[in-house]
């Protein structure tokens, strides 16, 4: 289990991690599609031209740019390098939960499922519901019209099957009276 050096301002850490997830999703998608070196992809996604004013996420839907402030860079790096390092394990965990072969999934959905699976299995410092909610939000933003439902269902099943998450999920269930 790894940790992150997130900003300490209330709410800032969550936003910084959300930005890290979004940037990691785009970088992992690029890696899946091109096979480009992860180090080169990381440098490309973190590079900002100081002469160019930052573009807010969403202004350029194909390649949003991020200012250095407000991005949990260690978390971005952990996601970007953690997913490929455990790719076979993640794919084996996901495959039985899918309604079709992993290789036939939309590349963005595949990247998002792998990202969520890695976080669920490696980042016990982040609640399971937060991880799934963030993945659903990214699917709504970047995925096909109904992909958020698919992402939600698969990651929910995965979380419930992970022994490391069992105590957290059971406590959550009791809190909600289910």
Curated annotation (Swiss-Prot):
Keywords linked to the UniProt accession: RNA-binding, Transcription, Transcription antitermination, Transcription regulation
UniProt feature coiled coil, ranges: none
GO biological process: DNA-templated transcription termination; transcription antitermination
Gene Ontology, cellular component aspect: cytosol
Keyword hit for Transcription regulation: yes
Gene Ontology molecular function terms on file: RNA binding
Family matches, as HAMAP family: NusB
Entry function: Involved in transcription antitermination. Required for transcription of ribosomal RNA (rRNA) genes. Binds specifically to the boxA antiterminator sequence of the ribosomal RNA (rrn) operons.
Family: Belongs to the NusB family.
Stated name of the protein: Transcription antitermination protein NusB
Annotated gene: nusB
């Amino acid at each position: 289990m790894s940790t992150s050096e997130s900003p300490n301002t209330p709410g800032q850490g969550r936003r910084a991690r959300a930005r890290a997830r979004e940037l990691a999703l785009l970088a992992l998608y690029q890696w899946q599609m091109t096979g480009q070196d992860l180090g080169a992809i990381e440098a490309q996604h973190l590079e900002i031209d100081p002469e160019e004013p930052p573009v807010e996420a969403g202004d350029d839907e194909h390649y949003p740019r991020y200012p250095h402030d407000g991005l949990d860079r260690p978390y971005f790096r952990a996601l970007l390098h953690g997913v490929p390092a455990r790719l076979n394990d993640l794919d084996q965990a996901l495959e039985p939960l899918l309604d079709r072969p992993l290789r036939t999934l939309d590349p963005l959905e595949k990247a998002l499922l792998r990202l969520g699976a890695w976080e669920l299995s490696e980042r016990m410092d982040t609640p399971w519901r937060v991880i799934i909610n963030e993945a659903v939000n990214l699917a709504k933003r970047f995925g096909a019209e109904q992909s958020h439902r698919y992402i939600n269902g698969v990651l929910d099943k995965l979380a419930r099957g992970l022994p490391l998450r069992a105590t957290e999920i059971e406590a959550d269930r009791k809190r909600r009276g289910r």
